[in-house]
């Protein structure tokens, strides 16, 4: 993230503060504070995971500057093509085996829906086939998995094809989730017990969408379907 932590290790300033860029403690004795918020890290939950003292913003830890203004809302994709679309445009490294198991069950329960993924390396047919097979093993049909290559700065446009986004866990989305909400697409998140697993919690709470915050994988599945 270009944070130049070796500089901070030399403590050039009497008080040093970290914010954003890295969703966890720096581990540096000379870093005195880390900016977070009361929803991402409620008092008493994560102090033991941080070498810094936590400065909790009263609402949300971040600001968001969209890359472009969205086109006028043209209706839900499901109403246009008759098929409900789940989507995830996070780094695919976040889509761990437990996430695939969870999403596979969601697709098993919604056989007419599809999952749209944006994956670096999607030009490799063997890699794409491997991803599809993982979801099939988890209960989905191969035809329910649509995989696109990374779209760089045009990623937000893909949300026009999505009805509901799925937040991975335990490493959930940050900017990707902000893009989703900006484009009018809500997402389901699983609340964890660390900052990196609760970014979705604070973003949904601060946009009035608490009903999309799940406390268990079973609840996550139920909210999605």
Q: Where in the sequence are the language-model features?
A:
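Active-site-proximal region of nucleotide-activated glycan assembly enzymes
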Residues: 10-72, 76
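A short acidic, amphipathic alpha-helical/loop segment
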Residues: 3-7, 101-105, 176-179
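Short, charged, surface-exposed secondary-structure boundary motifs
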Residues: 3-5, 25-31, 43-49, 176, ...
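Catalytic binding pocket for nucleotide-activated donors in carbohydrate/polymer assembly enzymes
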Residues: 160, 164, 168-225
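Conserved catalytic-core segment of nucleotide-activated headgroup transferases in glycan assembly
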Residues: 59-152, 158
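Repeat-solenoid scaffold signature
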Residues: 1-17, 21-25, 211-215, 219-221
